[in-house]
Design a protein with these regions (language model features):
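Membrane-helix/interface signature in polytopic inner-membrane proteins
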Residues: 108-119, 129
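Glycine-rich helix-loop "coupling/hinge" segments at transmembrane-helix boundaries
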Residues: 63-64, 68, 162-176
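Short, conserved glycine- and acidic-residue-centered signature motifs
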Residues: 42, 89, 118, 170, ...
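Anionic-ligand binding region
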Residues: 119-123, 130, 134, 153
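Membrane-water interface segments at the C-terminal ends of transmembrane alpha-helices
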Residues: 1-112, 136-161
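Glycine/proline-centered hinge or cleavage motifs at structural transition points of membrane proteins
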Residues: 125-126, 139
Length: 176
């Protein structure tokens, strides 16, 4: 029995959750500070899009953008010498994109539940916005943030559709 797909999946999900966790938290914080409702709704829709798209469609979009002839893929190949499509990095990219909405939505929900009086009190004590985020908001939202991380890890671990589209099914390299 070949266990390399299990090992590749575990490595991919572990590295992907590091990116997803940070990006999801930062995106949730960024959305909370948007003043315009139209801007919030637009970006919230963009951030949650991979959650409602079929995985193969999301993988197709990733292939279009990050493939050898796509705008981002061509840039990476020509200027950095890095080929994204059909590589192990593509499995990480697919896992990050597909698991990001779960982390983002969980973090946003947890951050929105924080009592605003705590934030106002921290501001009156002279804390910077980033200090408030790390010392007040994250500790109070930690259960929701952790649950988002667990959901995102599970989604990244089980991702196949988008991965098959952008990374292929190369034995010992991208087969998840």
């Amino acid at each position: 029995m070949d266990i390399s797909p299990i090992i590749i999946s575990m490595k991919t999900a572990t590295i992907a959750i590091l990116f997803t966790f940070i990006l999801g938290l930062l995106a949730a914080r960024w959305i909370l500070y948007r003043k315009s409702d139209a801007t919030r709704i637009f970006w919230d829709g963009i951030f949650t899009m991979p959650l409602v798209l079929p995985p193969t469609v999301a993988g197709f979009f990733l292939l279009v953008f990050f493939g050898s002839y796509g705008p981002v893929g061509k840039l990476f190949e020509n200027y950095l010498g890095i080929k994204i499509a059909f590589s192990w990095g593509a499995t990480i990219l697919a896992a990050v994109v597909m698991s990001f909405p779960l982390m983002y939505r969980s973090a946003r929900g947890a951050l929105e539940q924080i009592d605003e009086d705590l934030i106002f009190a921290a501001r009156t004590l002279g804390m910077s916005e980033w200090s408030i985020f790390f010392r007040v908001m994250i500790p109070n939202a930690l259960p929701g943030i952790i649950s988002g991380g667990v959901l995102a890890f599970a989604r990244g671990l089980g991702e196949f559709g988008a991965t098959a589209m952008i990374a292929g099914n190369i034995r010992g390299k991208t087969r998840t």
